[in-house]
Amino acid sequence: MLTLEKFEEASELVKRVTNPTKLIFSDYLSEQCGAKVYLKPENMQYTGAYKIRGAYYKISTLTQEERDRGLITASAGNHAQGVAFAAKKFGCRATIVMPTVTPLIKVNRTKSYGADVVLYGDVYDDAYNYACELAEKNGYTFVHPFNDLDVAAGQGTITMEIVQELPTVDYIVVPVGGGGLITGVATLAKMLNPKIKVIGVEPAEAASMTAALQAGEVVELDSANTIADGTAVKAVGDKIFPYVQENVDRMLLVEDDELIGAFLDMVENHKMIVENSGLLSVAALKQIDCKGKKVVCILSGGNMDVITMSSIVQHGLIQRDRIFSVSVLLPDKPGELVQVAKTIADEQGNVIKLEHNQFVSTNRNAAVELRITMEAFGT
């Protein structure tokens, strides 16, 4: 059972291993929303995400015999690092099962904390089922990433910090995957101040919590395909679900394209790297009528490899018409390319790639195809 005493105990314990992330006021988002928007940057946490909170508190509640058997968990990356880091602090062995699509940075960092990593399955649920098999076979103690009240209590320590720093907060906006984070955040928020509105945000293509709330019970999605890999969960936890039903005011959905835009905004306006799952709260702001209110958006993590970052930035620039390509046919004679370049320069465009093809088949004699990729101000 989640009690105020449990949250208070968890808050004291996690201070040993966490960075008390201070709220960051966002001028940019505040202007966009007409509200006072603050960011809770858990991407700046020691393991790059909030998950260390729940993992450390959960392991602290285990007996020495349970720890000595070795720990195992399944994770899309951030819980993996949390468990690996916490296990190292407690001096116990950890085995982590991760989906094969997990970003390399999360795999390598998990290994860097001394854990054994097993890659299995395409999504979290596949990895989870395999981890359960290994736990039963080898007698490991399973540390669930979200369907555990001790884990949820650890995650809820975020609320304690938010309310201590901003007692008059009106809204807390929370990324949602399996439901552990929002369970802890919402339950403690309602204990401390029932007037605080807690809003959960899911990827539209992995809306397992929304589906469960609509059905009145946990349901399993057929698929969970989203760039927000940390929240790609087919079914939420049944142990934490009643707390979500009771304490969460609203759920919102965000498309992948909106996450791409939010990533670009975060990089350009806040100079911060936040992974796609961690941006769900920010991407949903435009759906919330919060004018004149104080809003805290939890940025749940920032573990992202540079290849993924590069791809997201490129897609974001294309999405906003800041990078685009055109093809033109030109007479194959001197001076034509200069004229094209001058026209682009006059419109303040910047050529970043140029392909000149003299072998294109056209009905024009002596023509060449010019394919130009350029950068512009866009939208």
What are these regions (language model features)?
Residues M1-T379:
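PLP-dependent amino-acid enzyme catalytic core
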